[in-house]
């Protein structure tokens, strides 16, 4: 088993597909840091604090998992400072791989000691994307099969807030 990996993402929200990739990573690495990106270029439904709370709640019973936030700077620098030997990325489709492959090459250039590990989720999650979950949930659709009950509650709360405004 390898040492430590980081699993970065926006996780807006954290889905069962994300959880599946994390659990697969724990079969390979001794410890995985789930790292939430505070990406100013992405419009998110949940604040980074809300996303942090959701991920922490979902993974609280998983051993050897921690949750952190990357507020600024490069992921490669974060990986170096964290002592990570790998960056875990979930890949559902070919279009995911194209982008992730480019990012892995850049990260390898910036931090040659890190390896990007691409993991495919269970086939039942290949079409589950946070964007779709957000959209369906905000329109009142049932996404309970795709997210943890705590995340479902937070999506319902957001939907109620939006209706109130």
From Swiss-Prot:
HAMAP family: PPAT_bact. Keywords: ATP-binding, Coenzyme A biosynthesis, Cytoplasm, Magnesium, Nucleotide-binding, Nucleotidyltransferase, Transferase. GO terms for cellular component: cytoplasm. Its main location: cytoplasm. Signal peptide: none annotated. SUPFAM superfamilies: Nucleotidylyl transferase. The keyword ATP-binding applies. Its EC number is 2.7.7.3. Reversibly transfers an adenylyl group from ATP to 4'-phosphopantetheine, yielding dephospho-CoA (dPCoA) and pyrophosphate. The record marks 18 as: Transition state stabilizer. Its cofactor is Mg(2+). ATP binds at residues 10-11, 18, 90-92, 100, 125-131. Belongs to the bacterial CoaD family. InterPro entries: Cyt_trans-like, PPAT, Rossmann-like_a/b/a_fold. The lineage of its organism: Bacteria, Pseudomonadati, Chlorobiota, Chlorobiia, Chlorobiales. One of its GO terms (biological process) is coenzyme A biosynthetic process. This is Phosphopantetheine adenylyltransferase. It catalyses: (R)-4'-phosphopantetheine + ATP + H(+) = 3'-dephospho-CoA + diphosphate. CDD domains: PPAT. One of its GO terms (molecular function) is ATP binding. It comes from Chlorobaculum tepidum (strain ATCC 49652 / DSM 12025 / NBRC 103806 / TLS) (Chlorobium tepidum). It holds the Pfam family CTP_transf_like. PANTHER family: PHOSPHOPANTETHEINE ADENYLYLTRANSFERASE. Pathway: Cofactor biosynthesis; coenzyme A biosynthesis; CoA from (R)-pantothenate: step 4/5. It is found in: Cytoplasm.
């Amino acid at each position: 088993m390898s040492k430590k990996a980081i699993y970065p993402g926006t996780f807006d929200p954290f889905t069962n597909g994300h959880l599946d990739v994390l659990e697969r990573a724990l079969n390979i690495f001794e410890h995985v840091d789930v790292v939430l990106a505070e990406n100013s270029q992405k419009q998110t439904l949940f604040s980074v604090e809300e996303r942090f709370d959701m991920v922490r709640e979902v993974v609280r019973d998983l051993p050897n998992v921690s949750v952190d936030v990357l507020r600024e700077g490069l992921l490669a620098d974060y990986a170096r400072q964290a002592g990570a030997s790998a960056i875990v990325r979930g890949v559902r489709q070919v279009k995911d791989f194209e982008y992730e492959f480019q990012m892995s090459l850049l990260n390898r250039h910036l931090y040659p000691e890190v390896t990007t590990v691409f993991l495919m989720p269970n086939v039942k999650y290949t079409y589950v994307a946070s964007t779709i979950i957000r959209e369906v949930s905000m329109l009142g659709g049932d996404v309970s099969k795709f997210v943890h009950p705590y995340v479902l509650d937070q999506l319902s709360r957001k939907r109620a807030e939006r209706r109130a405004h």
